[in-house]
């Protein structure tokens, strides 16, 4: 053991005299630091946006409540902010937050149109365009590992020192193990140190930091073992580097793109635009239909309001909100198919990650950070649950002629972000 420590100390001093190694380590530190810095800035911007919108949301709703006195007008002119806050780990894994919406302002109109006004593609397998910490570790770090380890043994062979080093060393495993351990420890430190600083700034929990560290070290060890194994069995450093880079390109870029294309071509569903069009056509057509036609469709799902009677010959808020809901009912089948297809794509993407370690790491860390497609699905369900609770609060005033008083507005449901729940994410791991 003492000999091993001496070897490690010697290899550390030897590494510090190798300029190209130091340059690679510095580059890895700078790239990781840049990714963490931009991640922290993005999360801070999202949090500031949410806080600003919260204040505006309360102000706008109070203005509407001061201006209108009947429940129909209040429901129409009152917007409600919904949002999905970034977790404390989101700075390291921004995930799908640039693909799926994380904020919506909804009101008691047909919900499908409000959700799908901007359609989003399922990009679970699309290669990330942003540079966050997960992208650096999964896609760029293997290149640093390859450059550091491809010639660990081959360079000594080409210089003629290999046989001398092996013959004079007490153990070839201690010789190459200490050299590899020093380089591996150095590159892991350079890549992970910015993450630890970012975790302290964002107050990330210890368990989350530990799990991220574990996944990253295992992933980097995979590339290190692959590089050393090829270097041990091949004599030419350029040939070793070429093979490793080919593996890197295949696993980090080619397989994800092919998997994405295959999944998108094999799973079909209605588009968000189709859902939006169906809902809006139903709502627009309702203006020309008899009130009884709309109410029959409405009470199919809301039988408790079957005694509702249209107030007068003109416009009536109850009828208006009834055909808004009927519009959602008409688009419901398309919406369910769309969401089922998105969930199926995510499931198939999980199988594809078994062929691509970079994708597997991204998927695991995005799940830990609660920034993946599942988090987006949960946020959308929160919106639907909140909208339903809001409707159930207003419907007795609109359809059952219950007495309305503005003091009742204080008991209206409030949106709560349930996606930002680290313990829940851990239970799903």
Question: What feature does the model see in each segment?
Answer:
Residues 31, 35, 186, 190, ...:
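Alpha-helical transmembrane segments of multipass membrane proteins
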Residues 147-186:
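Helix-loop-helix units of permease transmembrane domains in multi-pass membrane transporters
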Residues 20, 132, 140-141, 171-201:
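Selective transmembrane-helix segments that form parts of the transport pathway or gating/packing helices
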Residues 129-155, 159:
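Long, hydrophobic alpha-helical segments
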Residues 145-149, 222-226, 242:
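Hydrophobic/aromatic residues in alpha-helical transmembrane segments
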Residues 212-234:
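Hydrophobic alpha-helical transmembrane segments of polytopic membrane proteins
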Residues 196-215:
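Membrane-interfacial helix-loop-helix connectors in multipass membrane proteins
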Residues 1-126, 249-429:
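Transmembrane alpha-helical segments and their membrane-interface loop/helix boundaries
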